[in-house]
Amino acid sequence: EKTAWLPYYYAAFCQVMAGTFSMPKDGSFGDNSAIADPYADKAEQLINKAAEMSQDNSEIFCVKKMIHSLRMMGNAMARYMTEGPKATAALEQAKALNENNPRVYILEGQDKFYTPEQFGGSKEEAKKLFEKANGIFMTSKPGSSIEPQWGRSQVTYFISQFK
């Protein structure tokens, strides 16, 4: 369907996830931009199409945040200072548009969880963010069966890491 934002949103989300899962599993932080960038570029094209159809949409800004994070993962040392602030700005916009979007808190929690403390990370803050996302999932229902609902399994996983 070429006239609705959701197909472009989901296609962009899938590109980000494919790019994330294509990254080296050895934890290396070298230049992996040849892996990450094609996925990020395609995701950006798709999410921009979604944004043309649905402006001021919290879900779209969550995916924009994910795209900037994927680019940063592609070459963290070279891109942290450029993609990091863009990712943060997209997430802040997502929260401003809908503070009850659990995906905002999942993404924020993941950042806090994986960032070393000396750079602003905090497992304690991450736990609170995952618990907030979980609370929103427990008390809200999507408007339709095709609206974004992802994130419950991530919340369950991360909360289990604190037991």
Where do the PLM segments sit?
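N-terminal leader/linker segments that initiate helical-solenoid repeat arrays
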Residues: 1-10, 14
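Short coil turns that delineate tetratricopeptide repeat
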Residues: 2-3, 52-55, 99-100, 138
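TPR alpha-solenoid repeat register
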Residues: 5-8, 60, 104, 143, ...
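Short coil/linker segments at helix-helix boundaries
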Residues: 14-49, 56, 63-90, 108-153
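A structural motif
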Residues: 59-65, 98-104
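Eukaryotic acidic, Ser/Thr-rich intrinsically disordered low-complexity regions
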Residues: 155-163
